Amino acid sequence: MIKLKSSEYKKYSKFLNNLANKLTRFYFLKLNKPFKVSNKLKGTGYDPVTNADIAFEKFIRKEISNKFPTHQIIGEEFKNKKTKSDFSWVIDPIDGTRSFVIGNPTWSNLISLNFRGIPILGLANFPILKKYYFNETDKVCLLYTSDAADDWFC
């Protein structure tokens, strides 16, 4: 099991909690409008990507890079940012792009922080529902509402 200092967990937890709120605001201010859909697969099959996928990933990468410039970033829409850091962020900017395309609100932004390849923190943000789940490895998972006043164990 990976053990980080409590202060490190707090730093990363605070960052992810703030990022969840920023992502929800970003969606409603910038992305809650008509969008383009294209197919990432050439030939047979269908793997949709929207301009919102790309915008979300750019936004997330910028937030991470500004706060943790030496960390690696692994994303779905762009090349991986490789560094010598033991920390890596894994991003799925829109998990459930097909749901996003048809207007189903169950799509989410998924972000994981890994230390030496092992997940230590995770975020599943649901902007339309104004809720997000936050988890620290081997700890309880929390559900936050847009007011952040009510926390529930999940």
Give the ranges of each region predicted by the language model:
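Single, functionally critical "micro-switch" positions that shape active/binding sites
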Residues: 52, 125, 149
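DPxDG-like acidic metal-binding loop motif
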Residues: 83-140
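Short, glycine/serine-rich, charged loops/turns that create anion-binding
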Residues: 78, 127-128, 153
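N-terminal subdomain of lithium-sensitive/metallo-dependent phosphomonoesterases centered on the IMPase/IPPase/PAP
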Residues: 1-94
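Single conserved hydrophobic/aromatic residue that forms the stacking wall/gate
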Residues: 144-154
